[in-house]
């Protein structure tokens, strides 16, 4: 059963649900992000070309699949002798164009550029080398 709560103070979506809002703007996306406060769910995606905002609230088992893929990438990177910086949760925004929240992302080649940062700003920071969305 889909249960969505959306008012001027709250944004929530029942686990396993997805909702798409057509005809939306970047300002609408930013407003929804602010309603979510510091929570990581529901995940929010915006695409200016489609003018859609997508809200997604994964099931608890979703995290297990993300953990497995993240661990697999780490094993491969260790075997290759590469250093990395992993970010999750993270909101990646290209101002006015797109906003997305991958399940996890890795900075490998661009690791040095973001070391010590708690937030990524794509207007000055490079994008992740690898983003995983399950």
Residue ranges and their predicted role:
Residues 1-134:
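Gly/Pro/Ser/Thr-rich low-complexity, intrinsically disordered segments predominantly at protein N-termini
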């Amino acid at each position: 059963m889909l249960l969505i709560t959306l008012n001027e103070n709250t944004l929530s979506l029942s686990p396993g649900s997805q909702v798409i809002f057509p005809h939306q703007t970047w300002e609408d996306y930013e407003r929804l992000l602010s309603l979510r406060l510091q929570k990581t769910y529901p995940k929010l995606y915006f695409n200016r070309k489609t003018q859609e905002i997508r809200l997604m609230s994964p099931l608890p088992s979703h995290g297990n699949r993300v953990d497995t893929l993240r661990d697999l990438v780490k094993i491969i990177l260790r075997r290759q002798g590469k250093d990395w910086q992993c970010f999750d949760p993270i909101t990646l925004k290209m101002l006015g164009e797109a906003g997305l929240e991958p399940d996890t992302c890795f900075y490998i080649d661009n690791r040095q550029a973001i070391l010590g940062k708690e937030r990524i700003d794509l207007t000055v920071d490079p994008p992740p080398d690898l983003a995983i969305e399950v």
